[in-house]
Amino acid sequence: MSQKVTPFMQSLKSLPADYRFDGSPVSDRLENSSGASVRLTNSNVPRKGGLRNGVSRTDTAAGDSEDSPYSGHGVFVEEQSLTDDVDSGAATMPLPQSDERRWSDTSAYARKKILQSWIQLPNGNWELGKILSTSGEESVISLPEGKVIKVISETLVPANPDILDGVDDLMQLSYLNEPSVLYNLNYRYNQDMIYTKAGPVLVAVNPFKEVPLYGNRYIEAYRKKSNESPHVYAIADTAIREMIRDEVNQSIIISGESGAGKTETAKIAMQYLAALGGGSGIEYEILKTNPILEAFGNAKTLRNDNSSRFGKLIEIHFSESGKISGAQIQTFLLEKSRVVQCAEGERSYHIFYQLCAGASPALREKLNLTSAHEYKYLGQSNCYSINGVDDAERFHTVKEALDIVHVSKEDQESVFAMLAAVLWLGNVSFTVIDNENHVEPVADESLSTVAKLIGCNINELTLTLSKRNMRVRNDTIVQKLTLPQAIDARDALAKSIYSCLFDWLVEQINKSLAVGKRRTGRSISILDIYGFESFDKNSFEQFCINYANERLQQHFNRHLFKLEQEEYIQDGIDWTRVDFEDNQNCLSLFEKKPLGLLSLLDEESTFPNGTDLTLANKLKQHLQSNSCFRGDKGKLFTVVHYAGEVTYETTGFLEKNRDLLHSDSIQLLSSCSCLLPQAFASSMLIQSEKPVVGPLYKAGGADSQRLSVATKFKSQLFQLMQRLGNTTPHFIRCIKPNNIQSPGVYEQGLVLQQLRCCGVLEVVRISRSGFPTRMSHQKFSRRYGFLLVENIADRDPLSVSVAILHQFNILPEMYQVGYTKLFFRTGQIGVLEDTRNRTLHGILRVQSSFRGYQARCLLKELKRGISILQSFVRGEKIRKEFAELRRRHKAAATIQSQVKSKIARIQYKGIADASVVIQSAIRGWLVRRCSGDIGWLKSGGAKTNELGEVLVKASVLSELQRRVLKAEAALREKEEENDILQQRLQQYENRWSEYETKMKSMEEIWQKQMRSLQSSLSIAKKSLAVEDSARNSDASVNASDATDWDSSSNQFRSQTSNGVGSRLQPMSAGLSVIGRLAEEFEQRAQVFGDDAKFLVEVKSGQVEANLDPDRELRRLKQMFETWKKDYGGRLRETKLILSKLGSEESSGSMEKVKRKWWGRRNSTRY
């Protein structure tokens, strides 16, 4: 395929046209490179005024810049004066107005510029310089800092013009070589444009900082195709659109070395898929699995603060409408050794530090947690924190995520208990018990805490860590363990618990995200697997990780190189083969049977006496002839990977490959009371019963042995590759710009080494010179055949396809027709897709307009029919309502007539009865007036004529009328009198109630007075009794004294005794009067009380009596007042008499008694 080359391009034929990543020239000459660049640039250079997404920059490397006809998605070249005197008079060129001028302006622009080339400095970095002169095999180069050096012309690498600085697709570079790619990525990296396309591959440079490229605004822009710059969102959008359009499962394969940003890139892709396919709520659960998996599967290493120590494949399932219906997570090769051993400056898994920092006081007390530096497993690396990371906050995030994926609170506490048990296991120490260095665990806090957390007996735990039961035939031998053996047993138990816990968590997450009956077969798989690793000391983990990367690189090569070129050849496409670095030899070194690395490793693992040294010797013996293997001294050997040489040390290879946990430890876990250890034991028993699939070795091999770690991992990789092989892959290559994890630092050597590993240059070359878009004749004709103007019903698919291409003026060099497919260069199918979409959109608008017209017509017809139907229905309804009203009116009229007739009959009967009464009264009166003279009545009172009629005199009739009027007047008077009497009766009833109230109050007052009189009387009785006793005592004393004073005078004694007797007689009479007064008081009180009670009963109607209770009550009150006055007078008289009797006595004490008594009496008197 020939193409015209511009004069300027012809002048550059003497320079090396293109370079591979190793810097050597290749057979792909300048014509192909420049020609391709011209065509691609033609589709991207805008017309004048068409700059968009521009940024301002100053090119310090070149030293000058001018207005450029190139816009290039994110580049804006600002005019600046030249710093040197070369070509100082160059004028700026205006932007072209047509396609021809556009290319002519580009050529003129290039001719005006001094040629620029890349030169490699002694430190390995590339520097941009200007070619001042060329003589023979040497050239004079001017460097940016002003130095002028002379170099060999063959070492120079052509540089792209500055108008191509920062292009977003490496396919647009005119010169495709290492320094140009490095410079372009560096330019974009400094502008925070971290994504660059390399053909079908997205190159993502880790910025080590937050960049404003994410969020809902960007998601919406990529969903609507309003932003076409390279991005993870664009890759995810392409995947989901192709899945729906082609009904083929998709995969997004993210690769790169540790610290390149693979985990974050995977999360960004999941974020976009969740935004586009969300709505059911399951997408939120899928996103929340990331904190859980990172906490339990990621750790800080020397190269990465958040390094994934396991591989994962997240398969997101979609419904037919493109909505997420579920997901499934598959994990690979968790680095269990990190649980018990960490290198200096690294950390174990994040969850341990998060638990120690963020556990609540109640949880800390329950798990007996302490700070992280007190656990030996965590303290051996002397690294407990990560700059800028709050472990306590991350722990709460993990707990929230566990809630979202439906892990119960009880299960969460069990998970944390297992983590604490692992930490405390590391603190279990041993003591020597005999001369043979046998040990047993120290019975301290660590041992008891472990037993408590996993729910086992402490004695069983002690036996498991210090002894081992071995079955020999039918006998059981108990072997005591030495210190190294006991430590290995302890660490193996800790690693197994953590590994099983990680698998259990993944299983719980998968249950929460299960698709179930909603599965449709459509899915997008996101692979985030550990990157290529090479350390100062590489062990079994790096061996497996790098093997996985070799397998992924082979998958990458197969899809982008092998299958691509094989398809071109099979379909008869005119194609120039592109060479690429194939890693099949290295992959065969690992997988070849029976003399591959994995086979020899498994074979040595089956030998009881096999050691790490015997393994190294065996590898050197059988693999020394392989070009990818080199045996070193001792336990070292080197493998030449696609990414570079890695030296491994076989120390620990056999132990880690066997991954044996003794049956005693499994039995211990199965005997625990907690559910999780029991589940772990069941899982390990199931795994231990699985034999090796197929005879890996010769007779006497490992058919009955447990699957080794390497074999299991190889099987998982084969299944993974098979699953990815059934999908359409989308590749993202993550690049780590520096090893210090600092933003803004760009290390050329490190980036270049990763680009070489990724094969980016080969990908761009094959994509630029190839046909990335292909479609079968049948599918192409079905998809775009309706765009043809002429009828194509009777034509074959190939003729239809060719007719479509001619109709839309697709240039012949932009496509090729194969035996079964059409092959298009980049961007060509997009033109047809745009036309198809516009046509379909127009068809849809026409259809919608026509369907709208049909719908409106139908609606009008329906409205008319509905109106008619409504009128009929409403008429029928009104007629029924009218008939009902007539029936109700007729029924009402009938009821009214019946009621009125009933009332009339009742009135008539009343009038008739009244008439009879009046007639009887009048007749009686007439009879009484006649004094029984009936004859007069018969003869004179009335006469009968011949016809039998009664004749009444006029005088009699007038008399009767007068009497009737009089009777009526009397009746009215009686009625008025009756009304007056009723009013008076009502007044009497009111007065009666008032009188009854007054009577009750008077009765209460009277009762109080009676009680007062009774109390006064009782006091008087008591006082008189006291005075009587006092007088008697005084009389006896006086008599004795008189006797003693003058015992000889009888006359005196006689007078004394007579005086006492005379005084005692009136006192006795006074007591009798008082007694009668008391009896009278009691009698009267009884009488008055009975009378009052009787009147109350009469008043209340309980007793019938022919008397007026009010008048009788007033009379009774008058009688009580009269008696009271009389009784009071008699009491006063009695007092005076008693006072006179008391005055005749000379004793002062009696007077005091009397005054006291009468004072009480007066105070209590009413």
UniProtKB/Swiss-Prot annotation:
Residues 955-1005 form a coiled coil. The keyword Heme does not apply. GO terms for biological process: actin filament-based movement; endocytosis. GO terms for molecular function: actin binding; ATP binding; calmodulin binding; cytoskeletal motor activity. SMART domains: IQ, MYSc. Residues 112-161 form the Myosin N-terminal SH3-like domain. Residues 165-837 form the Myosin motor domain. It holds the Pfam family IQ. GO terms for cellular component: endoplasmic reticulum; endosome; myosin complex; phragmoplast; plasmodesma. It comes from the Eukaryota. The modification Phosphoserine is found at residue 14. InterPro entries: IQ_motif_EF-hand-BS, Kinesin_motor_dom_sf, Myosin_head_motor_dom-like, Myosin_N, MYSc_Myo8, P-loop_NTPase. Residues 1-71, 1030-1065 are annotated as: Disordered. Residues 839-868, 862-891, 888-917, 911-940 form the IQ domain. SUPFAM superfamilies: P-loop containing nucleoside triphosphate hydrolases, Tropomyosin. It is found in: Cell junction, Plasmodesma; Cytoplasm, Cytoskeleton, Phragmoplast; Endosome; Endoplasmic reticulum. Residues 1-13, 32-45, 1032-1060 have a biased composition (Polar residues). Myosin heavy chain that is required for the cell cycle-regulated transport of various organelles and proteins for their segregation. Functions by binding with its tail domain to receptor proteins on organelles and exerting force with its N-terminal motor domain against actin filaments, thereby transporting its cargo along polarized actin cables. Involved in endocytosis via its action in endosomal trafficking. Homodimer. Belongs to the TRAFAC class myosin-kinesin ATPase superfamily. Myosin family. Plant myosin class VIII subfamily. IQ domain mediates interaction with calmodulin. This is Myosin-1.
